[in-house]
Design a protein with these regions (language model features):
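Catalytic alpha/beta core domains of metabolic enzymes, predominantly
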Residues: 4-159, 242-244, 249-391, 395-398
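A structural signal for short secondary-structure junctions
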Residues: 102, 162-164, 326, 388-391, ...
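Active-site loops and adjacent core secondary-structure elements that bind or stabilize anionic groups
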Residues: 126-238, 242-249, 262
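Radical SAM enzyme core and accessory elements
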Residues: 179-184, 415, 422, 426, ...
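Beta-strand/loop-dominated core regions that host nucleotide or nucleotide-derived cofactor-binding catalytic loops
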Residues: 421-424, 431-455
Length: 460
């Protein structure tokens, strides 16, 4: 039994809207019939191209089934995830968030690539989550005000541009020379340079330095100190409007909570070396919420990988639930291996966009293609991508056919959908605005549609 976010009936939409509640009720109507007739050979597939809707819908379905004593297996997937790193990151955010909580029996990673490219991605994702099984118990409590089914962003008091109503920040690690050389290209909010000051401080850049260096620096402009937990007693001795403090679950709560309450200028850098880092990092933030502490939290994740795809999958899977739970005020990805800093930074921004927390580029929703696709899907995606890549904030659907395309790209602002041999239809939202136009003209007419409708974006 499958339910897609973009294909709900008018009856369901009129009552629930395009919401997780509507998706779940649409599924439960059929499951109740199956249960009534004692039919158990059922697998459920709940999908959306929106990772937040997908995860919340599956969580709500599991809760609803439990209440009605149903225990059908679940198939997981982020529909029409796209291609390349974006498709992998989006899939890992959604699927990983559920697998990490023990939800899911089969998965599919839906990529606009050759079908055989999907299997290694899916296998690595499952294998990575499986490594966390059998871990030592994390003796944590859940904050009673936290709603796992309908989570809202954790309330924090902003420190400069971190927390509060700000979008989550991106932190990166660079040595001093790299920071001086690459920072013009970097879009990161904070650059950690450790114990070495950059040779030249670029205007608008923010540098995180070890607290000892901060104390010694004559010119502290654009510098922000970071303290390991062992240096917590020195926090009060250092004057700065923003301080970072590295913490992990298991630090004596009475010590670090008192420090955070006394110093609202602290941003917590939450780390973990636990086998189940998600559980450990969740535990620290819930401990803070129980104590009423509202300091922002940046999640720092450390890897030792040489393969960029593995890095993207693992980092996205680790961050998925933390973002969807509303706990994330920033991400800091680090890697001890042969992966370029630009790839690490790009992955961080990609994860935030996949989690619907921060938009940094155009988003593409595209199907894998099938026998009904009557045009060169991958070549068309490349041409549309090249022409629209700078249209930050737009979601563009590129679908092979009209059978599932309009429904499965329901979250897109604009759509390019195969309508027959040599014919394309263009969509604005869910409305078809140009029917059966020649394929050779379709990309240009899509651009014209965007530029006419969104001149502030389309004419960049």
């Amino acid at each position: 039994i499958g339910v897609n976010h973009g294909s709900l009936s008018d009856r369901i939409r009129n009552r629930y809207g395009d919401t997780p509640e509507g998706i779940v009720e649409s599924c439960m109507e059929f499951l109740r019939i199956c249960k009534k007739h004692d039919f158990g050979d059922v697998v459920i597939s709940i999908k959306s191209s929106n990772t937040v809707v997908m995860v919340r819908s599956v969580r709500l379905l599991v809760d609803t089934m439990d209440k009605e004593d149903m225990h059908y297996p679940l198939h997981l997937g982020v529909t029409e995830a796209g291609e390349g790193e974006d498709g992998r990151i989006k899939s890992a955010v959604g699927i990983g968030a559920l697998l990490a909580d023990g939800i899911g029996d089969t998965i599919r990673v839906s990529l606009t690539e050759e079908p055989e490219a999907e299997i290694p991605v899916a296998r690595h994702l499952v294998d990575y989550i499986d490594r966390k099984a059998g871990h030592q118990l994390i003796p944590a409590e859940t904050y009673e005000g936290f709603d796992w089914l309908r989570p809202e962003r954790r309330t924090t008091k902003p420190v400069d541009n971190i927390g509060g109503g700000n979008v989550p920040v991106v932190m990166v690690s660079e040595n001093a020379d790299n920071a001086a050389r690459d920072e013009d290209a970097s879009k990161a909010d904070y650059i950690y340079v450790g114990s070495n000051l950059p040779k030249e401080r670029k205007e608008g850049k923010r540098y995180v330095v070890d607290y000892q260096l901060y104390v010694q620096a004559d010119d502290k402009s654009q510098l922000y100190p970071i303290f390991p937990v062992t240096a917590m007693p020195f926090v009060s001795m250092v004057q700065a409007k923003l301080k970072f403090l590295v913490l992990q679950f298991g630090t004596p709560a009475d010590e670090y909570l008192a420090c955070l309450k006394t110093h609202p200028e602290i941003v917590v850098v939450c780390v973990s070396n636990h086998q189940n880092r998600l559980g450990s990092q969740r535990a620290l933030v819930h401990e803070m919420m129980i104590a009423g502490v509202e300091n922002p939290v940046v999640f720092a994740q450390m890897y030792r990988l040489n393969d960029a795809e593995e890095f993207q999958l693992e980092a996205a899977a680790d961050m998925g639930a933390l973002m969807i739970d509303g706990l994330c005020d920033g991400i800091w990805l680090m890697n001890d291996g042969d992966i370029a800093p630009s790839t690490i930074e790009g992955t961080t921004f990609g994860i935030l966009q996949a989690g619907r927390l921060r938009t940094s580029k155009t988003e593409y929703i595209s199907c894998p293609g099938c026998g009904r696709t009557l045009y060169d899907l991958r070549d068309t995606i490349k041409r549309i991508h090249e022409a629209t890549k700078d249209m930050k904030g737009l979601k563009i659907g590129i679908m092979g056919c009209i059978v599932n395309g309009p429904g499965e790209m329901a979250d897109a602002d604009y759509g390019y959908v195969g309508a027959g041999p040599g014919k394309i239809s263009l969509y604005k939202g869910k409305e078809c605005v140009e029917h059966n136009i020649p394929e050779g003209e379709a990309v240009e007419r899509l651009l014209r549609l965007i530029k006419t409708d969104r001149p502030e974006i389309g004419n960049k």
